[in-house]
Amino acid sequence: MEPFRNIGIIGRLGSTQVLDTIRRLKKFLIDRHLHVILEDTIAEVLPGHGLQTCSRKIMGEICDLVVVVGGDGSMLGAARALARHKVPVLGINRGSLGFLTDIRPDELEAKVGEVLDGQYIVESRFLLDAQVRRGIDSMGQGDALNDVVLHPGKSTRMIEFELYIDGQFVCSQKADGLIVATPTGSTAYALSAGGPIMHPKLDAIVIVPMYPHMLSSRPIVVDGNSELKIVVSPNMQIYPQVSCDGQNHFTCAPGDTVTISKKPQKLRLIHPIDHNYYEICRTKLGWGSRLGGGD
């Protein structure tokens, strides 16, 4: 296992807490005689940092490890940019839930130190590729670590669509939308819509209808290598949107097709050696502790 030498830092803008944590992290890494590289947008609000700066794309090409300081939203954005470069990513939580950024600020030096000493776990998380097509023309493409969501946008009207899996017709449906989520995204929007929690190691995709106008409609878990096709009804009067991780958005027209499949590149997500997925679920989702008051 090669030691990490070139460490990139990405952070969420607009937060003094994030900047304070980045300053601590920078000092800690420099004290360990490591080469530290700042994302250029963060460098602009850290005057006098004296470090090399670059874009996320370049960071993925030159770094051995990238540390993301922020919440899960910050990690989602970084993941889409860095997965293609296979650079491992570590998260320090400065958000709310922190399913992906699981190091607390108060344990920064201890946990990051363990990772630098080779004591860590690496998980591979797959991303989804979403393509919006109008006939043979591509109208938009996006990647998602959590989910791809078809929704009505600013309209309050229901969407009518057909769903196909691996070329086979599944159903037509009227609903407020449809969530297509990875195991990583199963604890995000899909969970709020009544979908199941899927362990990150599962090679599966969950399809969750949003308020379907059909009592028998339920979430479906399919093989992770499935190709999903959503055909927006040509008779609709609204223009629904497709959102990737809630951050990238594309507008569909009636009759458009949304194709969703797994991307070949995977995010390499690093956790501290004592990472416990079920403990995180228990803590973040408020599950009950052991009977008798144990941990």
Curated annotation (Swiss-Prot):
GO molecular function annotation: ATP binding; metal ion binding; NAD binding; NAD+ kinase activity
Catalytic activity as recorded in UniProt: NAD(+) + ATP = ADP + NADP(+) + H(+)
UniProt KW Ribosomal protein keyword: no
Active site: D72
Enzyme class: transferase
Keyword Ubl conjugation: no
The protein's required cofactors: a divalent metal cation
GO cellular component: cytoplasm
Residues passing through the membrane, by range: none
Primary location group: cytoplasm
Subcellular location: Cytoplasm
SUPFAM superfamilies linked to this entry: NAD kinase/diacylglycerol kinase-like
A Gene Ontology biological process term: NADP biosynthetic process
Domain of life where this protein originates: Bacteria
NCBIfam families membership: PRK01231.1
Summary of the function given for this chain in its UniProt record: Involved in the regulation of the intracellular balance of NAD and NADP, and is a key enzyme in the biosynthesis of NADP. Catalyzes specifically the phosphorylation on 2'-hydroxyl of the adenosine moiety of NAD to yield NADP.
Family the UniProt entry places it in: Belongs to the NAD kinase family.
Protein name: NAD kinase
Protein's organism: Pseudomonas aeruginosa (strain ATCC 15692 / DSM 22644 / CIP 104116 / JCM 14847 / LMG 12228 / 1C / PRS 101 / PAO1)
Encoding gene per record: nadK
